[in-house]
């Protein structure tokens, strides 16, 4: 069985609304305003380009600052250090460790990741977190110039590691990404919590 993990909001904390509230308190003075500003920044084509590896950080900062009328220095400080905000989620890391331990007992079990992640953040996570060595492989979007939920990135992971779709479970917090994986014939589950994921793996596949 192949288990394919997303990173943001699955293995690592990702709270864009909180980021906006902390960095731009006047513009994001209410939860609603913070959510609106977060969507305007992180759901925009420019951020997707940064995720995809086709837009450089400085270009992203300049465009976003002008488009959303945000202080460029504050925005640069935010964007340059987002990798430091991506902290491991202990419960999910513990579940990953359980799967890593089980892997030695099951010859057909493999662990992979598939993450939309700008190149600077991807390299920082690789340097900081030894548990990423538990994975047998994976793909960061910025390294291959494709992003979820576009089918090409799923197909690339599948071909690179010879994944059998019916023996692959994809785990992501965003429904469009889950549906895209299912469109490739993979099993997929929308992540809510480590407990929910553990129960799903146990019930559907007999592990854990």
Residue spans of the language-model regions?
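Active-site neighborhood of HAD-like aspartate-dependent phosphohydrolases
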Residues: 1-42, 183, 207
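Short, acidic loop-to-helix structural element flanking the phosphoryl-transfer center
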Residues: 2, 75-112, 151, 194
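Generic enzyme active-site microenvironment
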Residues: 4, 114, 170-171
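Generic structural signal for small/hydrophobic residues in well-ordered secondary structure
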Residues: 6-9, 53, 113, 138, ...
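Alpha-helical elements of Rossmann-like donor-binding domains used by nucleotide-donor carbohydrate transfer enzymes
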Residues: 18-22, 45, 59, 63, ...
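Acidic, Ser/Pro/Thr-rich low-complexity regulatory regions
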Residues: 25-32, 67-70, 104
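Metal-dependent phosphoesterase signature
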Residues: 46-94
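Asp-based, Mg2+/Mn2+-dependent phosphohydrolase catalytic module
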Residues: 118-119, 123-208
């Amino acid at each position: 069985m192949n288990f394919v993990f997303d990173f943001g909001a699955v293995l690592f904390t990702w709270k864009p609304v909180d980021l906006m509230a902390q960095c731009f308190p006047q513009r994001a003075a209410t939860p609603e305003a913070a959510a609106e500003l977060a969507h305007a920044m992180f759901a925009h084509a420019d951020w997707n380009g940064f995720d995809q590896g086709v837009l450089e950080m400085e270009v992203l900062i300049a465009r976003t600052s002008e488009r959303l009328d945000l202080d460029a220095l504050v925005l640069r400080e935010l964007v340059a250090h987002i990798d430091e905000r991506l902290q491991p989620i202990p419960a999910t890391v513990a579940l990953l460790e359980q799967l890593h331990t089980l892997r030695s007992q099951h010859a057909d079990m493999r662990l992979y990741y598939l993450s939309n992640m700008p190149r600077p953040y991807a390299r920082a996570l690789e340097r900081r977190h030894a548990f990423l060595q538990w994975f047998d492989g994976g793909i960061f979007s910025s390294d291959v110039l494709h992003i979820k939920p576009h089918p090409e990135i799923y197909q690339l992971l599948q071909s690179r590691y010879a994944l059998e779709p019916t023996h692959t479970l994809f785990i992501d917090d965003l429904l469009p990404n889950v549906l895209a994986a299912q469109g490739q014939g993979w099993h997929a589950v929308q992540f809510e919590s480590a407990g929910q994921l553990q129960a799903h793996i146990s019930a559907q596949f007999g592990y854990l």
